[in-house]
């Protein structure tokens, strides 16, 4: 087992209707979600998961705590040119906005996602902007794939046609960063809901059944789940969190 560290790179927060995360649960509620890239700190390559949302798109009244990716990387002693690999969980505009910042990086995306993103269906068109990635020479993947020793992608479509989650080996087990947009409550529903499988489906989906099944696929593949938009990571320096003793599967941390 490798000993990677996951460093959350929060570049802002956004207030959204809760049901966009938790499929029809919490109608009328507004929550604050985190907007992130994720730096994977390891022995060799500098790896980034997603490039996050462009600042211009976050500067509206419901956005707060906005900071640039360059500033976040500086916290880790890095510059954008130091990034070797970028893994795109999917190609919606809020996850792929800063590709041009990383001139030396090799980019990975799923083939199905790329093909959809360059000519999206009208029902999903407003989530994509190919200008953000049209100059990127992606390595296009076809399903589950190892990226480097200790880091692999798990094909988890449903949120989009080509969503991929990322599995990272750490000293406490395999950490899974969801490729689909969700919060901790998707994997920790209120007891009163009495859900069959212990999950709440995501609220934004291309295929709801596929999305649900792939939530379970990811949960079964890892020991610790990082929900992609969970606000908790705004003030977390690294995962695994040193102060926590990890002794149970599927802890949301």
Protein language model features and the residues they cover:
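Basic, amphipathic N-terminal segments that precede the first structured/catalytic domain
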Residues: 1-29, 145, 166, 240-241, ...
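Conserved beta-strand hairpin/beta-sheet module of binuclear metal-dependent hydrolase folds
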Residues: 11-71, 165-183
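Residue-level marker for buried hydrophobic side chains located in beta-strands
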Residues: 47-49, 87, 107, 175-177, ...
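Short, glycine/acidic-enriched loop or turn micro-motifs at the edges of active sites
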Residues: 53-54, 93, 113, 181-183, ...
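Metallo-beta-lactamase
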Residues: 67, 72-78, 82-94, 106-155, 161-238, ...
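Short, conserved loop/helix-junction motifs that constitute active-site signature segments
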Residues: 100-103
């Amino acid at each position: 087992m490798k000993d990677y560290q996951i460093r959350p790179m929060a570049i802002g927060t956004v207030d959204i209707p809760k049901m966009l995360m938790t499929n029809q649960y919490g109608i009328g509620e507004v929550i604050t979600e985190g907007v992130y890239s994720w730096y994977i700190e390891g022995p060799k390559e500098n790896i980034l998961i997603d490039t996050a949302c462009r600042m211009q798109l976050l500067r509206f009244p419901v956005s707060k705590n906005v900071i640039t990716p360059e500033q976040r990387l500086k916290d880790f002693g890095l510059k954008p040119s130091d990034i070797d690999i970028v893994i795109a969980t999917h190609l919606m505009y809020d996850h792929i906005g800063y590709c041009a910042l990383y001139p030396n990086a090799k980019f990975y995306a799923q083939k199905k996602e790329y093909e959809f993103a360059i000519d999206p269906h009208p029902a999903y068109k407003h989530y994509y902007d190919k200008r953000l990635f049209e100059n990127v020479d992606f390595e296009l993947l076809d399903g589950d794939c190892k990226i480097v020793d200790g880091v692999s992608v798990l094909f988890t479509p449903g949120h989009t046609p080509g969503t991929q989650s990322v599995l990272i080996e750490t000293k406490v087990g395999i950490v899974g960063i969801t490729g689909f947009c969700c919060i901790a409550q998707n994997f920790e529903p209120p007891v009163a809901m009495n859900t069959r499988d212990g999950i709440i489906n995501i609220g934004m989906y291309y295929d709801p059944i596929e999305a649900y099944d792939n939530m379970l696929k990811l949960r079964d593949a890892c020991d610790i789940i990082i929900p992609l938009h969970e606000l908790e990571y705004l003030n977390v320096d690294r995962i695994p969190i040193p102060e926590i003793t990890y002794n149970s599967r599927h802890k949301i941390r």
